Amino acid sequence: MKLSLPALRNTPWFKATSGQWRYALRNTIAMCLALTFAYYLNLDEPYWAMTSAAVVSFPTVGGVISKSLGRIAGSLLGATAALIIAGHTLNEPWLFLFSMAAWIGFCTWACAHFTNNAAYAFQLSGYTAAIIAFPMVNIVEITQLWDIAQARVCEVIVGILCGGMMMMILPSTSDGTALLTAFKNMHARLLEHASLLWQPETTDAIRSAHEGVIGQILTMNLLRIQAFWSHYRFRRQNALLNALLHQQLRLTSVISSLRRMLLNWPTPPENSREVIEQLLAELAKPRADSYTVAQIIAPLRPQDEQDYRHLAFWQRLRYFCQLYLRSSRQLYLIESGAPVDQIHIRRTPGLARHTDNAEAIWSGVRTFCTLTVIGAWSIGAQWESGPGALTLAAISCVLYSIVATPFKSLSLLMRTLVLLSLFSFVVKFGLMVQITDLWQFLLFLFPLFVTMQLLKLQMPKLAGLWGQLIVFMGSFIAVTNPPVYDFADFLNDNTAKIVGVAISWLAFAILRPGSDAVKSRRHIRALRRDFVDQLSRHPSHNESEFESLTYHHVSQLSNSQDALARRWLLRWGVVLLNCSHVVWQLRAWESRSDPLSRVRDICISLLRDVMSERGVQQRPLAVTLQELQRICDTLAHHHQPAAHELAAIIWRLHCSLSQLEQAPAQGTLAPGYLMTPQA
């Protein structure tokens, strides 16, 4: 039977692009080299080297370097912890179990407090300790502790070195190119986002678009970290890239602020929409300049000095144009490789983030309880394969405690383990028993891994499954030195691994992570607490830090299915962020008129009275809004131009707070979920 040409073209090998072939060959060769080197170094379980090479198979240089550093640090820390715990408690099974469960629970708690490399290092330290320590319960000689620990660390390092070497031989696309492309795409998308938000209607598409823009900007921080590790140029420009991220977040805030003003402006100019479209079209041009932009927005300049609404919109629109043009210029200089000294940009710290400490503690407790239950069962039943169940349970609890959908991830892992159990049985007892040399086995592995890598790239919906099959295949085939073919041990070990994941799934079902509604309430409470701090004389965060912290809170529920929780978290974030910008502008606003300064202080005190960590209280929101409106109308008739500017700023505060009038009535939400208790 002959294969037709269309059928051949549909195979993964013929469908693959050159980039996909490069990725598949690089990772496959790295895994085969890692297995070969570990085997000839006489490491007793060389398949861990192959697994390590698979784990660090990132598509970019910076990703490989950053993940490798985190993996080495985590492996060394985990091996040290395993040696200390096992060395002192191995003769006392219960003390050993509680100590290991406590350490892995601590690592689960700690990884929730960090991001990127640090979080990955704590994850590795947790389940590396499990991989090393739990199999030690079956050893007789205490001197074997060091041999096992150094063998596991050596296998990890061999896999990392092979992955790094293949990345140098078959490099992928530049991290810097990917970062700059993402910056430019986001810069252009902000104009599209402005055109969408500056429309009078309110739809779910607008909310989703706003969440999407926030999430994409925060995701670029990961690209910045990868670029930092890939090239010295981006290490020198790291502070500038941080500043660009903050500027894009500020542009998002200004777009939202202008939207609030347009929605609360009773009589905007008739030509405002036409002028805005012309402005956005001009800003989209690569050579846009300040003079042309000024000519376009000139028709929107307020003619009536007492029209504080028009003045507020005009000032904020000018600020948006200035900030966008400045960002365009700075992005062009960074892309063209200009020296750092020539790029005039304010250096800012990295993006701020918040840790849900209650959820982190709960995850640590869940890990401790899961391992304790499995360990108690193993000790009581004298289950020889108990270490395998403990190891897989530790990996599951540590890895999936910080994912958004742990049940989906654990179900996928269960599916992976069942498929690998069947496949490894055929490979081990049908093929490997007939192989006498390693090179013969590599001839089988090489095309297999290449095909799986290509399928992972060509089937995005099943990429997670193919990735787990590649990573866990080594531990199921278990290429040991020397090889061992014992069907009873094979069956018991695979059963133990599946049981360990199943009990982890059960633990997540019993000790469930907080619901999205609960998480939303905690994030909103933290937002209000940080905003109250912003009203103090010496706030803990400056304007940019509070802005990035707020957007980090909002992004935490971007994948939530609870639309109400997600909507109110976004609404509170936008309201408090717009209010904080007004507060910082009021602080910077100065006038020689003492009465005007007192008016400014009154507005800040109104915010202190109306906002607390528990919500809007002490003064009804409607009364506060009426007071702000009265102040604006009074200042509009003042003879000093500074009073008109102050009225414009206060009206922006009124527009921001008015969004909280849409809070649901008490009793329509779950207990404790009321956003504005006295609205």
Swiss-Prot record:
Keyword annotations from UniProtKB, A to Z: Cell membrane, Membrane, Transmembrane, Transmembrane helix, Transport
Pfam families, alphabetized: FUSC
Ranges that cross the membrane: 23-41, 46-65, 72-90, 94-113, 120-142, 157-179, 362-381, 385-404, 411-433, 438-455, 462-481, 496-515
This protein's encoding gene: ydhK
Alphabetical list of InterPro entries matching this protein: PHBA_efflux_AaeB/fusaric-R
The UniProt record lists the keyword Methyltransferase: no
Molecular function terms, GO-annotated: transmembrane transporter activity
Gene Ontology CC terms, in alphabetical order: plasma membrane
Topology of this chain in the membrane: Multi-pass membrane protein
Organism name: Salmonella typhimurium (strain LT2 / SGSC1412 / ATCC 700720)
PANTHER family per the UniProt record, alphabetical: MULTIDRUG RESISTANCE PROTEIN MDTO, P-HYDROXYBENZOIC ACID EFFLUX PUMP SUBUNIT-RELATED
Compartments it resides in: Cell membrane
Family: Belongs to the aromatic acid exporter ArAE (TC 2.A.85) family.
Protein's name in the database: Uncharacterized transporter YdhK
